[in-house]
Amino acid sequence: MERTSKYAEAIDTASQPETVIRASSVTGQQGHLNSVDMPLVETWRPEGPRASQQNHILLSPEQEVSQSSNTSPTSESDPQAFLEASEFPQNQTKTSRVDPVHMEIDDWAAIDQPMADSAQPDFEDWGDLGDLMPEVLPESSGTSSGAATDNGTAADDENRCWDHGCNGKKFLNHSNLVRHRRENGSARPKFICPMCGAYFSRSTARNQHLEKKSCNRVRRYSNGRERPRLRVKD
């Protein structure tokens, strides 16, 4: 029982790099494991990061100090030494940039002079165009005003009624003119006052006329012309 438990313990501890030395030391001291079982523990070699950890563990303190002293300086520990060891030194990298062309003050003045002369426009050639502008503007404004007046007179003529004895009665808009023609047309019945013979396009207007007893009042158009009185047939 003791032999099997120690064998299982040695196999479990072999999965870590630190336990390899421990397993070999246990087998060396006690000698209970067989010679066939020894290579299973001693010949195992970890790979990758574990190998570096094992190598680090196996080194003695004196070897670690000597190895750390022999390491070369890197760019992180000493950037100046890294630049000196490289092919392109620091001074050469700074001077590798292309500087702008340096010119003297006299050269800049000679270049600016023709540019300043060409930037100034020549106003002498604009005299004819300036004389024509005042003459063109009034003509354009006059034509626009004339077109506006023509449109206004045409609209006024369209909103006038020359039928039904209206003698060119003017309405505010076209819709009022259409309603006037519909009310005074032959298709719509006319409501006549039985007292004076006046006719109305709506029954409400005829009834108000009778209530106010305005039969003796002379009825006139909006332009002041007297309306003809219709005679009621017996």
UniProtKB/Swiss-Prot annotation:
Entry's Gene Ontology molecular function annotations: zinc ion binding
UniProt-recorded name of the protein: C2H2-type zinc-finger transcription factor clz7
SUPFAM superfamilies given in the database record: beta-beta-alpha zinc fingers
Location(s) in or outside the cell: Nucleus
Major subcellular site: nucleus
Organism, scientific name: Cochliobolus lunatus
Family listed: Belongs to the GLI C2H2-type zinc-finger protein family.
Region described as Disordered: spans on this chain: 45-99, 118-154
Ranges of biased composition (kind: Low complexity): 66-77, 140-154
Zinc finger residue extent: C2H2-type: 159-184, 191-223
Domain of life: Eukaryota
Lineage of producing organism: Eukaryota, Fungi, Dikarya, Ascomycota, Pezizomycotina
Alphabetized UniProt keyword annotations: Metal-binding, Nucleus, Repeat, Transcription, Transcription regulation, Zinc, Zinc-finger
Encoding gene, per UniProt annotation: clz7
Role description: Transcription factor that probably regulates the expression of the gene cluster that mediates the biosynthesis of squalestatin S1 (SQS1, also known as zaragozic acid A), a heavily oxidized fungal polyketide that offers potent cholesterol lowering activity by targeting squalene synthase (SS).
Gene Ontology CC, one term: nucleus
